[in-house]
């Protein structure tokens, strides 16, 4: 096999890894405390052409971080606090590698920043929902994306050695923004006063010592002699706020099994078949034939083979591969296959056992995977036909779609279904359930939908409740769907990306929507501007000894 949907295999990014393959991170556990140590291999870049100096990172480093976090969640339920620190002297992390950014295409930079944002959002997600706390032990200079990683943690402790500082130097040094949530977390999360934030984000040297604490940029500054002892004490204190189980046995995350061929990516419960000429992919999620685990003990015994977790891992991998490796595949056709009642029964099992640590972590995996769909810059059409199983958890996929078409078949039964999972278990990045977001939290339509929880609904019933966009009959189905797909595929992908991002998240703002919808949007615009990436732009000239030449006109 030479290519997947015209994409050379050698150019494909693989998001699967495991600790034995790590080149940059190490994970150690000691009872309720885990330590993630960043010690980057300078020659271990995911692409050639740059060295990862000063503990700077690229996509490959973050793929390892994402994997390590998953292993803490599932393999180490006894861990309550994760200490994030550096294995290099006097440097915590200097952020994204500047030379990598300078060499990268616009699309690579955008996808890189999106994935790193999702990984840091996932840190906060685990703290909020799973009781897994994070402590940034900044044992050296903490700059740019390094500080953004620290910002995602529950607490930040900076060593007071008269040299180490925290900084966001992107504006003065590179002519770009801190693109992994830095600006937003400084204001929304750390509550740094605006004038202090303005100074902090426009000086390259950063802020150190007591001033960093006074400005709320860190929680503590500690002398080097007391640093290790202080970190241990704070890690234990954070652990006391967690309810993760001390005696639970973890579930080993084995390598995800899949087949890759010229048509796409194929898993046991997920399939992504690409139509390269039509620039579309059919993304299908399959339900199991029956419910095979009902109690917490039975669920834990199944481990990674428990359908909700296995399906979520497969879907997550498919999404990441499509987003990174197939930029021109702009329309995702979302389908399901299976018995809708089986999905509702599995949801009932999830709901009954949601206090179990493993079920809770699986819910978290599903929540983050579904959120990944929401923020993907692709058009999403759900196609609901007889034999599909858009019910409960899988109905969330249809609710994430920009449009949903449901065949009103004359003979075959075609249904969608609602479960407890549809009413707050899987909030979007704006904090709302997809039902609440769909109806702008209006009480009457939300109540009408909630009254049908546990029911399987016909096309007419789904249409009346506002759960689907259209219900063509047998005569019109093929033509209406074909026209909708062809019309969408003919529109400007840039305009569609902006359109979809504006329409999907409704009137409610959160820190995460501001990161994706404001910070990322401005960063992506700046990434295209000559002041950053032109021949004389700051990002292009970084490290050359030459001074950037700016176009001084404000736009």
From Swiss-Prot:
GO molecular-function term, one example from the UniProt record: lyase activity
Domain of life of the source: Bacteria
Pfam family, one: ECH_1
Induction remark: By benzoate.
pH profile of the protein: Optimum pH is 9.
BP terms from Gene Ontology: fatty acid beta-oxidation
Main enzyme class: lyase
Entries under CDD domains matching the protein: crotonase-like
Gene3D superfamilies attached to this UniProt entry: 2-enoyl-CoA Hydratase, Chain A, domain 1 (3.90.226.10)
UniProt-listed Enzyme Commission number(s): 4.1.2.44
Keywords, comma-separated and alphabetical: Aromatic hydrocarbons catabolism, Lyase
InterPro entries: Benz-CoA_dihydrodiol_lyase, ClpP/crotonase-like_dom_sf, Enoyl-CoA_hydra/iso
Catalytic activity: 2,3-epoxy-2,3-dihydrobenzoyl-CoA + 2 H2O = (3Z)-6-oxohex-3-enoyl-CoA + formate + H(+)
Subunit structure: Homodimer.
PANTHER family hit by this protein: ENOYL-COA HYDRATASE, MITOCHONDRIAL, ENOYL-COA HYDRATASE-RELATED
Family: Belongs to the benzoyl-CoA oxygenase component C family.
Described purpose of this protein according to its UniProt entry: Catalyzes the ring opening of 2,3-epoxy-2,3-dihydroxybenzoyl-CoA to form 3,4-didehydroadipyl-CoA semialdehyde.
Designated name of the protein: Benzoyl-CoA-dihydrodiol lyase
Species of origin: Aromatoleum evansii
Taxonomic lineage: Bacteria, Pseudomonadati, Pseudomonadota, Betaproteobacteria, Rhodocyclales
């Amino acid at each position: 096999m030479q290519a997947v949907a015209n994409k050379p295999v050698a150019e494909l990014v693989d998001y699967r890894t495991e600790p034995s393959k790590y080149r940059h991170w190490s994970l150690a556990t000691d009872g309720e405390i885990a330590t993630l140590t960043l010690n980057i291999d300078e020659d271990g870049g995911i692409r050639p052409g740059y060295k990862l100096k000063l503990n700077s990172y690229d996509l490959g480093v973050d793929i390892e971080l994402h994997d390590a976090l998953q292993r803490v969640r599932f393999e180490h339920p006894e861990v309550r606090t994760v200490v994030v620190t550096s294995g290099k002297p006097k440097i915590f992390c200097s952020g994204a590698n500047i030379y990598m950014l300078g060499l990268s295409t616009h699309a690579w930079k955008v996808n890189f920043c999106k994935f790193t944002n999702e990984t840091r959002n996932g840190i906060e997600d685990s703290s909020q929902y799973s009781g897994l706390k994070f402590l940034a032990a900044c044992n050296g200079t903490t700059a740019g994306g390094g500080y953004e990683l620290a910002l995602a943690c529950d607490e930040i402790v900076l060593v007071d050695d008269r040299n180490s500082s925290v900084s966001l130097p992107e504006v003065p040094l590179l002519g770009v923004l801190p693109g992994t949530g830095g600006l937003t977390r400084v204001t929304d999360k750390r509550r740094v006063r605006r004038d202090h934030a303005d100074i902090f984000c426009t000086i390259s040297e950063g802020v150190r010592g007591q001033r960093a604490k006074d400005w709320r940029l860190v929680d503590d500054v500690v002398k080097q002699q007391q640093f290790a002892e202080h970190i241990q004490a704070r890690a234990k204190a954070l652990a006391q706020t967690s309810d993760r189980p001390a005696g639970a046995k973890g579930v080993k995350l084995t390598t995800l099994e899949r087949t890759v061929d010229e048509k796409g990516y194929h898993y046991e419960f997920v399939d992504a078949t690409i139509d390269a000429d039509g620039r579309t992919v059919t993304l299908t999620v399959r339900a199991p034939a029956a419910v095979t685990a009902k109690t917490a003990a039975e669920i834990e015994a199944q481990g990674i083979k428990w359908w909700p977790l296995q399906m979520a891992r497969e879907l997550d991998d498919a999404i990441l591969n499509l987003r990174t490796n197939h930029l021109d595949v702009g329309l995702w056709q979302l389908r399901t296959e299976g018995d809708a009642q089986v999905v509702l029964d599995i949801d009932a099992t999830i709901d009954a056992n949601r206090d179990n640590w493993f079920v809770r972590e699986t819910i978290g995996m599903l929540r983050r995977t579904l959120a990944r769909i929401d923020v993907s810059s692709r058009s999403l059409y759900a196609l609901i036909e007889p034999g599909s199983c858009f019910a409960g958890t899988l109905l969330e996929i249809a609710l994430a779609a920009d449009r949903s078409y449901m065949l009103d078949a004359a003979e075959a039964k075609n249904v969608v279904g609602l479960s407890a999972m549809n009413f707050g278990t899987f909030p979007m990045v704006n904090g709302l359930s997809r039902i609440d977001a769909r109806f702008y939290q209006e009480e009457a339509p939300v109540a009408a939908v909630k009254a049908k929880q546990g029911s399987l609904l016909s096309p007419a019933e789904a249409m009346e409740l506002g759960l689907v966009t259209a219900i063509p009959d047998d005569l019109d189905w093929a033509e209406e769907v074909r026209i909708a797909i062809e019309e969408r595929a003919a529109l400007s992908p840039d305009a569609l990306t902006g359109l979809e991002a504006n329409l999907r998240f409704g009137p409610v703002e959160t820190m995460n929507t501001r990161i994706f919808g404001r910070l990322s949007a401005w960063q992506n615009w700046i990434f295209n501007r000559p002041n950053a990436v032109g021949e004389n732009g700051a990002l292009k000239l970084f490290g050359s000894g030459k001074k950037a030449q700016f176009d001084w006109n404000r736009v």
